[in-house]
């Protein structure tokens, strides 16, 4: 049976439990300064990162300690049930369960939260309790006024125990520092049953198997296999304490196994280790993790944190973040803009996550153990339906040293996975979440931009199979009929449109491989979007197998019936502008440029009302434009193709100001592994990739007075906005290295050479800039 492929299942489960889409307080009315307080000595760019942005509302981010693209995300968990706890943490909560070592950043589906550790004093409890009923549990209350976070560091005071907890991390190791009060019964709880509880009423995660072993008097090792969103994934750990414990006991199904039992297997395992403490005594704990084995976790631990110097690990984590954040420097008089930008940059560098051990071993998508060539790294956590749009284009500018490994990891997945090419891979398991197969545009973009050290010869045969052979989620109908019938397949309109874009991407891979006939076939097929466009109403619309149009039709609705949704986390208003690659042909369907622009204007000026069954993913509304979900992200830039880029400039500047704020509820929707932030980064710099596969960017409205991007080839790109101001969003003129530049777009090849783009801004639009046909962005070329 096919697993549900969208995030809607998680949203619906949360709604049933009363935990989703509840009204939230106004964060801007709260004192956020204490949560954003920085540690002494943090004076670089990391001081501008407000990690709590996105931890409230529907942002779904966590505030914990990690390094760029780290395997470990060591963070507090406040609750693990309900849609708004996909990351394990929500800023509304007032108690902490403990600190687990893996987290998803901003997703709308939930998993991970592996290897929970919680310190305590007094009698040990092994029940996690609930936010509503914490009595007799190991959780503790806390206050945001006693909580701090910065890149690579988190701290909180656990009020119920009088313990100060601090966290930092390397790539594969989480390091804890706990300052205890005097107590002969101080202890730690290790909970291998902790994790996402879906549905929330179940009260424990779905563990297939787990094992735990007490080694000597200072080490605990183990692992588990979990059946949640990524069913059947493995995680192993090696945990070492700086102080020998005086006693240790394993619990199975909440029952103590006795002090003589040193190891156990089961589906609900916990362990309590006792460490009596004096006043202000510090105990360190370091935890290595691995998808391969306990031995792999121990190797990671010993290689990355051989000693007990917490501050050295903290400094190294901070320096790693400084190195990455320094790739883009900005000048602006508005501190909030600077904080939002560097927080967005931070969030954009969390995933994909490292997925190979220090010895090069990793678990493949066939669940077997493989070894990489020396120096190579493997990655996981690819939210491709989201991130192909802006995050991966951003990486081609600022992550070119990691990008080959990230791309080669996807090729390995396609070779090893029984599910074929990656869709939403997580820790060696294909979740199958969301539609399309948008690893294709990521690899096609890299091929077009000539990203080196990638084995492109392997790519086309693997992705060709999905495009030309696989009977995958309606692709058989799509190939035979040119569209997917909405009475035979759920979300048929969105699937048709996204397969058309994937065809466009695979066509580029075919051309690179010399498969010229199939290149043309795929190119032609990428115009299948026409087959779900109803010219009588100028909307994308569901179509039955007999080719008749689905009724009833409401462009705000999710589909033509409660049984059959026609759109994926969107409606017809948003799907009607999903076209990214064939804009000039597409405009003809609206009667030309004028009709297309009028339709775009109407989208933004419509009522924002949605039907009751609309998922909360459709958020951040401006008319029927939904910035809180990815299908809308390129839409404001489409005006440039119709010769009116000044409308793009006005819309983009408005979205930059309205959809991002310096507070916990500061995102318009899910962060989605960096995509929501990448839109902000690219747009604030002044350009965006409407069609990433083309290798081109469209000008928007730069937010900063000056931005400098350090390119990997040693060159720099400077974007300077002259006479920039909140009421001056319009581009009056552009010069490139001092020469007049009249186009509303540029290519990746151009900016890869560096240079200075000077944009003179004004309060009134210059309607001649970018208006001429020869100055508009290319499309389908």
Q: How would you label these PLM feature ranges?
A:
Residues 1, 21, 34-35:
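Short, low-complexity interaction segments enriched in Ser/Thr/Pro/Gly
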Residues 1-18:
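N-terminal secretory signal peptides and thylakoid transit peptides that target proteins
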Residues 22-26:
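Hydrophobic membrane-targeting alpha-helices
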Residues 32, 36-441, 447-497, 505, ...:
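Accessory carbohydrate-recognition regions in carbohydrate-active enzymes
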Residues 502:
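ATP-dependent phospho-/nucleotidyl transfer catalytic cores
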Residues 717-725:
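Short aromatic-glycine motifs in intrinsically disordered, low-complexity regions
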Residues 730:
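Extracellular attachment/recognition segments
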């Amino acid at each position: 049976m096919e697993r549900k492929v969208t995030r809607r299942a998680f949203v619906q489960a949360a709604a049933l439990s009363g935990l989703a889409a509840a009204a939230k307080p106004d964060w801007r009315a709260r004192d956020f300064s204490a949560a954003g307080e920085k540690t002494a000595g943090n004076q670089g760019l990391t001081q501008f990162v407000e990690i709590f942005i996105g931890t409230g509302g529907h942002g779904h981010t966590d505030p914990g300690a990690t390094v760029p693209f780290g395997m470990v995300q060591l963070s507090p968990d406040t609750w693990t049930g309900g849609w708004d706890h996909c990351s394990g943490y929500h800023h509304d909560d007032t108690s902490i369960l403990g600190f687990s070592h893996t987290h998803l950043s901003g997703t709308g589906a939930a998993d991970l939260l592996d290897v929970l550790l919680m310190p305590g004093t007094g009698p040990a409890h092994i029940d996690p309790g609930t936010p509503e009923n914490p009595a007799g549990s190991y959780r503790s209350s806390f206050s945001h006024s006693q909580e701090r976070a910065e890149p690579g560091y988190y701290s909180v005071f656990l009020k119920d125990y009088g313990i100060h907890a601090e966290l930092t991390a390397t790539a594969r190791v989480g390091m804890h520092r706990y300052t205890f009060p005097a107590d002969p019964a101080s202890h730690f709880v290790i909970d291998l049953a902790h994790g996402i509880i879906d549905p929330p009423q179940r009260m424990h995660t779905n563990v297939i198997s787990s094992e735990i072993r007490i080694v000597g008097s200072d080490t605990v090792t183990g692992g588990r296999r979990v059946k949640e969103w990524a069913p059947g994934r493995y995680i192993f750990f090696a945990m070492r304490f700086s102080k020998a414990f005086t006693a240790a006991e394993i619990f199975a199904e909440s029952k103590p196994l006795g002090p003589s039992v040193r190891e156990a297997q089961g589906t609900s395992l916990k362990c309590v280790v006792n460490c009596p403490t004096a006043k202000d005594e510090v105990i360190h704990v370091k935890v290595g993790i691995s998808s391969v084995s306990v031995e792999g976790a121990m190797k990671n631990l010993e290689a990355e944190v051989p000693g007990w110097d917490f501050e050295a690990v903290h400094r190294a984590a901070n320096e790693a973040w400084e190195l990455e954040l320094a790739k883009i420097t900005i000048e602006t008089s508005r501190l909030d803009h600077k904080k939002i930008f560097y927080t967005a940059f931070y969030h954009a560098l969390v995933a994909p996550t490292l997925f190979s051990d220090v010895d090069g071993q990793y678990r493949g998508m066939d669940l077997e153990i493989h070894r990489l060539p020396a120096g190579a790294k493997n990655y996981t956590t690819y939210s491709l339906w989201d991130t192909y749009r802006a995050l991966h284009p951003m990486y081609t500018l600022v992550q070119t040293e990691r990008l080959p490994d990230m791309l080669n990891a996807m090729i390995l997945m396609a070779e090893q996975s029984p599910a074929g090419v990656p869709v939403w891979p997580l820790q060696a398991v294909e979740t199958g979440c969301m539609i399309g197969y948008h690893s294709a545009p990521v690899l096609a973009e890299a091929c077009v931009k000539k990203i080196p050290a990638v084995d492109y010869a392997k790519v086309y045969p693997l992705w060709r199979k999905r495009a030309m052979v696989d009977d995958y989620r309606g692709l058989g109908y799509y190939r035979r009929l040119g569209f997917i019938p909405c009475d035979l397949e759920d979300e048929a309109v969105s699937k048709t449109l996204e397969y058309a874009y994937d065809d466009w991407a695979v066509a580029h891979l075919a051309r690179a491989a010399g498969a010229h006939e199939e290149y043309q076939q795929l190119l032609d097929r990428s115009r299948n979007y026409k087959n779900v466009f109803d010219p009588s109403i100028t909307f994308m619309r569901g179509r039955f197998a007999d080719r008749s149009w689905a009724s009833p039709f409401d462009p705000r609705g999710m589909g033509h019936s409660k049984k059959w949704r026609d759109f994926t986390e969107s409606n017809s208003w948003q799907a009607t502008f999903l076209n990214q690659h064939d804009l000039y042909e597409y405009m003809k369907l609206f009667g030309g440029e004028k009709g297309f622009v009028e339709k775009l204007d109407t989208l933004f000026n419509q009522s924002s009302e949605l039907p009751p069954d609309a998922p909360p993913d459709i958020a951040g509304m401006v008319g029927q434009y939904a910035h809180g979900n990815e299908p809308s992200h390129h839409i404001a830039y489409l005006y440039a193709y119709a010769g009116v880029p000044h409308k793009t400039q006005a819309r983009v500047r408005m979205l930059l100001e309205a959809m991002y704020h310096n507070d916990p509820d500061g995102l318009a929707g899910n962060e989605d592994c960096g995509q929501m932030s990448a839109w902000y980064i690219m747009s604030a710099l002044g350009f965006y990739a409407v069609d990433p596969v083309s290798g081109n960017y469209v000008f928007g409205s730069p937010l900063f007075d000056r931005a400098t991007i350090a390119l990997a080839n040693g060159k720099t790109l400077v974007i300077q906005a002259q006479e920039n101001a909140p009421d001056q969003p319009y581009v009056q003129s552009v010069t490139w290295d001092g020469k007049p530049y009249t186009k509303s777009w540029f290519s990746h090849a151009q900016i890869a050479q560096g240079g200075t783009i000077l944009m003179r801004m004004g309060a009134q639009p210059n309607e001649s800039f970018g208006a001429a046909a020869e100055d508009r962005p290319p499309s389908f070329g």
